[in-house]
Structure formats: C-alpha cells, structure tokens
Amino acid sequence: MFLSLLILLSYALGFVFCVVCLACGLYYFSELVEEHATVAKRWIKYTMWFVMGIIFLLGIFEDLDFTSLLFSFIGHCCYYTLLTEFPFVTLTGYKFILSVLSFIISHISWFIYFRNTENWYPFGEIIAIFTFCVWLIPLIFFISLAANDNSLPMANSYSSHSNSNIIGVDSEFTKKKSRISVLKSMFAWAKEKTSDITGQKSMKHYY
C-alpha cells in the first residue's frame, strides 16, 4: 500500500518536472524568436511548406479522410497569412480569427475520424498525424507571435496612453517596442498573480 503511494507520488513529481522543463524551454525559445524575428519567420515559412507537403503526400499514399486532410491544408493556408505581420498579430483581426477557427475545425474533424471504430489506427500514427497536421504550426506561432499589450493581462494603460500622443516614425517604433510575446506575457502575468496570492514581492534596495 505504502509503495503504491510512493509510485503515484513519483509519477506526479515526474509530471510536474516535465511541465516545468517544457515551460522553461518554451520561454527560452520565445526569447530567441524575439531577438531573431527575421530568421524565425523564415524557418516558420519553411516548416509550413514542409507540413503542407506532408499533408499532400498523406493524401496520395495513405488511406486517410480527404475532408480532414483538406481542413488541415486550408488551416495552414490561413496560418500562412499571419506571416505578413510576423512577429506581430492583431487578436481581433480576421486573419487571426480565421486561423483559430480553422485550427478548431481541423482538430474536431480528425478527432471524429479517429473516434470512428471503423477507422482504427495505432496510437503512434494518430499522434504523428495530430503533431504534424494539426498542432505543430499553431504551437510555433503561439510561442513566437507578439500581441498588442492592450489585449494581454499585463496591459499597462499608462504606456498605451503615452504612445497615443506620439506621432510620426517614433510612434510606430514605440508601438512595436511596447509589444511583447504572448508566452512571456503569460509567464509574467502568472508570476504576478502568484506573488499576489502568496504575498511575496521581490524587494530590491538601491543604495
């Protein structure tokens, strides 16, 4: 009995450790993307072509649902339109909304197809299809895209008010500098909320 509890505890600790490592890796990757946006944009474009080629080859050589493959291909066409403004994105823009809708539709389509008992596939093949045809590009965009600071939990009303009073080239530069990656904003927001709950604030003294 006691050994069974230790096994469950070890699984829980292993899961937490993996989640923390994954979060740290994603945060580091978002830092790299922010510093090298042009290179990141080029690699995302090549990765998108690679995934679209995989979808095309799956439609030729594998007996998969044509509708699900078509939804995945259309979804990646929608993702491709986001590259025109990379690494910035407007969360209320039609490009972003269409991309989110296409991701949801593609995910549901594949889920319904694999849920059908007549379409039995090994678990590894299902994960491979979801990884490349559904999850890969949206995950890359999630950790690399930047959003307007007004649409994130860490929004600063003062900075946005100050930016609105500046015109010309400096205004555009200030707007871009005030945008931070979505993932970094989420980490900062989570850190602030954790500090509020625990009552622990970082105290820095300058002499």
Curated annotation (Swiss-Prot):
Q: Which GO terms describe its molecular function?
A: COPII receptor activity
UniProt keyword Transmembrane present: yes
Q: What are its GO biological-process terms?
A: endoplasmic reticulum to Golgi vesicle-mediated transport
Q: Where are the transmembrane segments?
A: 2-22, 54-74, 94-114, 126-146
**Membrane association type:** Multi-pass membrane protein
Q: What keywords sit in the KW lines? A: Membrane, Transmembrane, Transmembrane helix
The record, for Pfam families, names: Erv26 (PF04148)
Q: Where in the cell is it found?
A: Membrane
Q: Which domain of life is it from?
A: Eukaryota
- InterPro entries from the xrefs? Svp26/Tex261
Q: Which GO terms describe its cellular component?
A: COPII-coated ER to Golgi transport vesicle; endoplasmic reticulum membrane; Golgi membrane
Task: Assign the protein's first listed, main location to one coarse class.
Answer: membrane
Decide whether keyword Transmembrane helix is in the record: yes
Protein family: Belongs to the SVP26 family.
Protein's name in the database: Protein TEX261 homolog
